Amino acid sequence: MKLIFCLDKNNGMLFAGKRQSRDSILYEELLKRIGECKLWISSYSASLFPQMSNIIIDDDYCSKATENEYCFIENKGYEIDNCKSVIIYKWNRLYPSDTSFNIDLKKNGFKLTLKRDFVGNSHEKITEEIYERV
């Protein structure tokens, strides 16, 4: 499977169980990136995405997604062992956080294959990083 995260400058993900931020352009870019592939999301994330046939809302997505399908991770657990790529969208800001992404991707066999910046709706810079398992 392929995991997708949104992180702040310190790899923060959540604060008090809530997402740190959101940006409509980021979600448009994410949907362009995945194309027609399936995107698994939790019920918590459902309000961020339009209703589309390739978006599946299921709180047990990590156990159901197959090798070439995507999982958007916000407030649920995940397994990096079965993952073949990781996409990280980084906000250009620091937000309060009490849940962070603390996995060393390089130590877990991933290599950065793409890094690009784009302008968001409410963020002057969002960085997309794609890591592939080598």
How would you describe each model-predicted region?
Residues M1-V134:
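Enzymes that bind and transform nitrogen-containing heteroaromatic metabolites
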